């Protein structure tokens, strides 16, 4: 089990757990992985998706925020980072999660708030750092931290191109 734990100003300790087996149905554990965020004053968020290495990927993902199902979608073939952003509908809000500078930098945003995240390393980070802007609250922070445990490389154009053959083969097998 890999986890990151640290203080978040005003919210206490927050923990990102990977893999979070408790969010994956027993019969799915061979093909799906899960990640979960918990904390003292933060709503629990969880995500499960098909495994890619040690992380769940966006394909066939299931997202839960504060005990409620949330919807996600993305446009994999858009040219711009903003166009390829993951769109999230959770707890009555609409978010976008996208890569910014490079594969170590991401941002979760909604009209009133933004949480910028940075990893010390793209693949196996020792440190995950975040900065909240605007009216960011515990739900925003929970989601931003959660997506740091999900394989999101295909939010970049190069990542989308690298993962394209696997996606096409997976669809051909359906």
Language-model-derived ranges and their functions:
Residues 27-73:
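A glycine-rich, hydrophobic loop/mini-helix early in the fold
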Residues 96-98:
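Phosphate/anion-contacting hairpin/loop surfaces
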Residues 1-29, 100-174:
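Low-complexity or membrane-interfacial segments used for flexible interactions
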Residues 79-83, 133-135:
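Long, distal/terminal scaffolding or interaction modules
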Residues 58, 82-84, 102:
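Short, surface-exposed coil-to-beta transition loops
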